[in-house]
Regions:
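Conserved helicase NTPase motor core
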Residues: 8-19, 23-31, 38, 58-59, ...
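P-loop NTPase Walker
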Residues: 1-104, 108-109, 212, 242, ...
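Helicase P-loop NTPase motor core
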Residues: 27, 31-43, 276-279, 285-381, ...
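Small-residue hinge/turn detector
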Residues: 647-650
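C-terminal accessory/binding modules appended to enzymatic or scaffolding proteins
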Residues: 591-638
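Short, polar/flexible loop-turn hinges at active-site or ligand-entry regions and domain interfaces
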Residues: 51-56, 76-82, 97-110, 121-132, ...
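ATP-hydrolysis module of ASCE/P-loop NTPase motor domains
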Residues: 21, 100-194, 218, 280-282, ...
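Conserved helicase C-terminal RecA-like lobe
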Residues: 163, 167, 354, 368-380, ...
């Protein structure tokens, strides 16, 4: 792509970013404004006109997915050789390279999870800890390290920031635990992820020859999501720069949602104080979302007030055509909310929206269970973000081994995607997805993601750089090392924090009530302001369809004491709550049946469900719940239309089980009316 073509593809503000080739540059980019497009085109333009040497550019971001997307964009622009990595991936690579020369031998083993070491450190101190305490203490140790707070400084730092120690412990105990944690690591000769950044930063700071070599290699730096940088990451960035100013940072203070982990927007907000000569460029044209979504997002931030950063917020300007209005629904309880969301998602899928373009977002991971059950009842496939990592799945590892072998004997005359399909077919993949869900469908989904990636690479290929199985394997290896998995089909269930950086055609924001949004643990003004920003992030994930909801009660029949979130004051329309769903509390289905023959029908339905569960290797409740079976036994539907009105049966289950269920009902004699 020519330099002119690179610039032509940009809007005026994005073009300004691309032309700002020499730092320092700060780009304030709102959600959906094309920041990745702007910074990748900036790099590509610099390379194309000869201002940048590709291998001298280091672009760092916070997630493997974002780094992978940046590499893909650069490759599509015809740029090879630029290093786009997370902070940790870049640091780990450099530390591994220099360690043998500076220290000698191999670097210590990387301990990915702190739990075992934290538990041992606590045991040595005589502390009683359970799994939850270990998790909370691990998070506190991580906060201290990324904040550059030592064990000796912890009490003072915690007091100064108003940070409370994990429940059941005081600051002095946490300070002692940090010391014990470091001792256990030293004895076991392991390091954690924070050590990787600390050790490399110290190595660059104290060994001039190492610093000179790194700074000679990397002369230009780009940092994405700069509002989330921690003091530790800033320390390493300063060592990489070595006083130079060839730095471009991109961020949005309104998307700061990781303060609890040590991230701070201070570095972004004070960038021009550190670099008075810095050029500031603002991206506010939102290409992602409809005006309805953008306006709601803007209004949520405006209501934060000056103390909440409203004066610093970028006011987005929607570029898309108008879409449907945001929907607001108050359900009777959490179960009704989950069922309602699943039903609405199923309707979107029927209307043509892909399942992978739908997400249900909530404040805490504990909220996922109700939605998992509801989507299973509705026959809609789903993926819980944060589950087993894609590249850890056995079928994926086996498939990559087969592709690696096929690369050695690949026919250059055959299209690469066709060869990939042949290889995976031998491993059990088929053109059509299996009808059953469960393990078999998950296995197919994973292999289908590899097929889709092969198609994507072939579509981006050029005569000079054709798509090959060798190239596919190399791409998979790079993604595996960065945990950047290809997309698997299914509705996404995720926490709001896990959704950062992602987007979907349709987004359901669930649990929009006080106590969940903001979370009850947000007791300070700063914490509440961050919760508002978290809602803003959730809203701006939606391209077209946006629905916000909450349950007035936690359980069916419970007291409707919940109130909708304060963040939507003046925005949530006054409208009646959703129609009360006919629900059967779990464990009471049989008690609600009307007679002996209904009970017999209920038993027959349960026996059929057990057979289906065994055949499809899936939990029985995911076929149909007891509540749904009880409703069928009471209503005794005689036609598909009647069956479709039963709560818990969606279109997919009608297609799959409808005829069989009607046959079971018809074969069960009804008791005469008294």
């Amino acid at each position: 792509m020519s330099p002119d073509a690179i610039l032509t593809a940009l809007d005026p503000e994005q073009r300004e970013v691309a032309l700002a080739l020499n730092g320092p540059v700060v780009v304030l980019a709102g959600a959906g404004t094309g920041k990745t497009r702007a910074i990748t085109h900036r790099i590509a333009y610099g390379v194309r006109i000869g201002a940048y040497k590709p291998t001298s550019v280091l672009a760092v971001t916070f997630t493997a997915r974002a780094a992978g997307e940046m590499r893909t964009r650069l490759r599509e622009l015809g740029v090879q050789g630029v290093q786009a990595r997370t902070f940790h991936a870049a640091a780990l690579r450099q530390l591994g390279y220099f360690w043998p020369r500076v220290v000698g031998g191999a670097p210590p083993r990387l301990q990915e999870h702190k739990a075992q070491i934290i538990a041992e450190a606590a045991r040595r101190l005589g502390l009683s800890v359970d799994r939850v305490a270990v998790r909370d203490l691990s998070s506190e140790v991580e906060w201290a390290k990324v904040s550059l707070v030592t064990a000796d400084d912890y009490e003072r730092a915690a007091s100064a920031t108003g940070r409370e120690a994990p429940s059941g412990y005081d600051a002095q105990t946490v300070s002692r635990l940090i010391t014990a944690y470091e001792d256990v690591k030293t004895e076991r000769e392991v390091i954690d992820f924070e050590d990787v950044l600390l050790m490399l930063g110290d190595m660059l700071n104290s060994h001039k020859n190492v610093a000179d070599e790194v700074r000679s290699q990397y002369r230009r730096f780009v940092v994405d999501e700069y509002q989330d940088v921690s003091p530790l990451q800033q320390f390493l960035l300063d060592q990489w720069l070595g006083g130079r100013k060839e730095l471009c940072v991109v961020g949005d203070p309104s998307q700061t949602i990781y303060s609890f982990t040590g991230a701070s927007p201070r570095h972004l907000l004070e960038f021009r104080r550190a670099y008075p000569e810095a050029q500031e460029i603002r991206l506010v044209r939102d290409y992602r979302s409809t005006p309805q979504v953008v306006n709601l997002a803007n209004e949520v931030l405006k209501r934060a007030g000056r103390a909440g950063g409203a004066h610093q917020a970028l006011e987005l300007v929607a570029q898309r055509k108008p879409g449907p209005p945001a929907a607001f629904t108050a359900y009777d309880d959490d179960e009704a909310e989950a069922k309602g969301v699943a039903t609405r998602a199923a309707r979107l899928i029927q209307s043509g929206v892909k399942p992978s373009e739908i997400a249900v977002l909530y404040r805490t991971n504990a909220q996922s269970e109700a939605f998992e059950a509801a989507f299973a009842d509705a026959g809609v496939g789903y993926l819980v973000r944060g589950g087993q990592r894609f590249f850890q799945r056995k079928e994926v590892r086996d498939a990559i081994v087969l592709l690696r072998g096929a690369a050695r004997s690949a026919d250059p005359e055959l299209p690469m995607p066709d060869q990939v399909r042949d290889v995976l077919a031998a491993a059990g993949w088929a053109d059509q997805a299996p009808a059953a869900r469960g393990a078999a469908r998950e296995r197919w989904d994973a292999m289908q993601a590899l097929v889709s990636l092969a198609d994507d690479l072939a579509a981006a290929a050029t005569p000079e750089d054709p798509a090959t199985i060798t190239g596919l394997v190399a791409e998979l290896d790079e993604r595996a090392s960065a945990q950047h998995a290809p997309t698997v089909e299914g509705v996404t269930l995720a926490s709001l924090h896990a959704a950062k950086g992602l987007e979907w055609d349709a987004v359901f924001l669930a649990g929009m009530s006080e106590g969940l949004m903001p979370i009850s643990l947000a007791e300070t003004d700063a914490a509440v302001h961050e919760e508002r920003r978290l809602l803003y992030v959730g809203i701006t994930r939606a391209r077209e369809h946006l629905e916000l909801s909450f349950g007035r009660a936690r359980n069916p029949g419970g007291r409707a004491s919940r109130k909708r979130t304060r963040f939507l004051d003046g925005l949530w329309p006054d409208e009646p709550r959703a129609p009360r769903a006919r629900s059967v509390p779990k464990g009471r289905a049989r008690a609600l049946l009307t007679g002996v023959h209904d009970a017999a029908l209920f038993d027959a339905l349960r026996e059929w469900r057990l057979e289906v569960a065994r055949e499809t290797d899936k939990p029985a409740y995911t076929v149909l719940t007891d509540a749904t079976l009880a409703a069928i036994a009471e209503i005794r539907p005689s036609a598909i239309a009647e069956l479709a009105r039963v709560d818990g049966i969606g279109p997919a289950k009608i297609d799959r089980y409808g005829a069989t269920i009607l046959a079971i009902v018809a074969s069960a004699p009804a008791e005469p009316s008294p």
